[in-house]
Amino acid sequence: MTTLTGYKSTILTLCLLSAWVLGHAQENEKPCLPVRDIPPSQMAFQAGEKLTIIASYQWGVVNTDVGTVSLDISRSDSSDVPLFIARGRIQTARFFNAFFRVDDYYESRFYRTNLRPTYFMRDIHEGKYTIQNYYNYNQDHTINARIIRKDGSVQDTLLPGRICTFDFITLFYFLRNLEFSNMNPGDVYPISFAIDEEIFELYLRYDGKDEIRVQGLGTFRCLKFSAQTVAGVVFDGKEDLRFWISDDKNRVPLFIESPVVVGRVTGRLGSYENLRFPLTSKIK
């Protein structure tokens, strides 16, 4: 069974992953999450959108912001096929750098029509741990992956992807464009993404509509989702990760929470720019 045990994530990396994708790892083949061409008028985001998620750690009386996750998206017209380019940056707050410094960079290029990835890279610096991933996605859905580790060793491998196998930056934008009107509470959706030299097969559950207050932004109508975390060095595998996205056409992540082995991690939307649609989910 494939698990995330031993995967060297930090609180900030987990907040980015947790925004959409952590769940139960399984061995058997799963049905694919539907991949479809999305009419431009229905796209949940636009070039120029910028989101900042504030990551926090809670344990007993300790409740502190530890860093930020920043995401922005632009368009590329330099290739024969129009693409989106999404970039992510994860950084610890200055005071936290003395304990454990994180400075991670992600970049993904994907089709503007169906949001399928063509290229992905990540450059990870977490304490003394560093790693780089470079992926090129092929027409047959396999992935040419190059993994470069701290000692300079290079691993080239071919990953057996499927049409619904994403990198987790592209997955973030793809999932915002699901056909939410067809969802019912309790519906479960398969998710597949690549990281390092592995493919992870996970599940996402829709839990229905809710309201949530986001510090500094207000109260919003939202859609609530959950996923079962995988037991390992950070999660205990006993409780669900939960997250809330805006119940409007933008589908932006508002709040994320998950128990960890010691304490709890959360991520809340801190700021946003250039949303495609009015944020009509805001109540007050």
Please state what every model-predicted region is.
Residues 1-11:
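Bacterial N-terminal signal peptides that target proteins for export
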Residues 11-19:
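Bacterial N-terminal signal peptides
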Residues 21-25:
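Sec/Tat signal peptide C-region and signal peptidase I cleavage site
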Residues 27-138, 180-284:
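Acidic, serine/threonine-rich low-complexity disordered tracts
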Residues 139-195:
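Active-site/ligand-binding surface loops and adjacent short beta/alpha elements
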